Design a protein with these regions (language model features):
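Conserved mixed alpha/beta catalytic, RNA-binding, or beta-rich assembly cores of soluble enzyme
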Residues: 1, 5, 16-19, 27-48, ...
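Hydrophobic alpha-helical positions that pack around
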Residues: 62-174, 180-185, 195
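Iron-sulfur-cluster electron-transfer modules
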Residues: 1-107
Length: 212
């Protein structure tokens, strides 16, 4: 469910000749202004930890990390306390910087290992990386038998009257989310989907919410 839309099942099925050694949960918001992962950590910490445990069992490792930038002290404190029930899961506070949420940067910050140049992948240094939204979706799929039909979306910006994180159905038009947050002034220059650094301007606000 990350921006790169890399298939989850591929990460959970390591290729022949590779050996997972740890699971790293990317709880670093990869773009400024985005806070969907932060809200999930604060509102669903128990579910996130169960999801991490499920992923670790699926890939056969006994060590998991949750990397959270240090500008989210409430999430760090909450997850650290909750993780006491999971001695194999460690919450790792990370320096606030861009692009800390990049897979290679995250792996280096958490483990000290560097992923070689492409076509090398995180699994080549023993890491399986998933983001918070995917962890929560895995929890719901396994524990509640719930298919993926909704996700948390951040709607924010200086022109947004009521910035919010919304639980939206896949396929919901963006303009409905914007209206839910109070709408936009008529002279709004552009609406960006995906974040201010790597996102793209939306030419049409009828575009739907996607899984990635």
């Amino acid at each position: 469910m990350g921006g790169a839309t890399f298939p989850c099942h591929v990460k959970l099925t390591p290729t022949k000749g590779t050996k997972p050694e740890c699971v790293i949960i990317n709880a670093v918001e990869c773009e400024p202004y985005l806070t969907a992962d932060h809200r999930l950590l604060l509102e669903k910490p128990d579910e996130i930890l169960v999801g991490v445990d499920l992923i670790m069992k699926a890939v056969g490792v006994d060590k998991g990390y949750i990397g959270i930038e240090n500008n989210k002290p409430d999430a760090i404190a909450l997850l650290t306390e909750k993780a006491k029930a999971y001695p194999h899961i460690e919450v790792v506070p990370l320096q606030e910087k861009y692009p800390q949420g990049g897979e290679k940067q995250l792996i280096a910050a958490v483990t000290g290992r560097e992923v070689p140049a492409p076509p090398a992948l995180p699994i080549n240094v023993g890491a399986v990386v998933q983001n918070v939204g995917t962890v929560f979706a895995i929890y719901e799929a396994v524990m509640k038998n719930k298919p993926l039909f909704e996700r948390v979306i951040t709607v924010t910006g200086k022109e947004v009257q009521n910035p919010s994180n919304l639980l939206a159905r896949i396929g919901t038009p963006m303009n409905q989310l914007i209206e839910e947050c109070g709408g936009l002034p008529e002279n709004t220059g552009k609406v960006i989907g995906g974040g201010p650094m790597m996102g793209k301007a939306l030419m049409n606000l009828d575009v739907p919410v996607c899984k990635g």
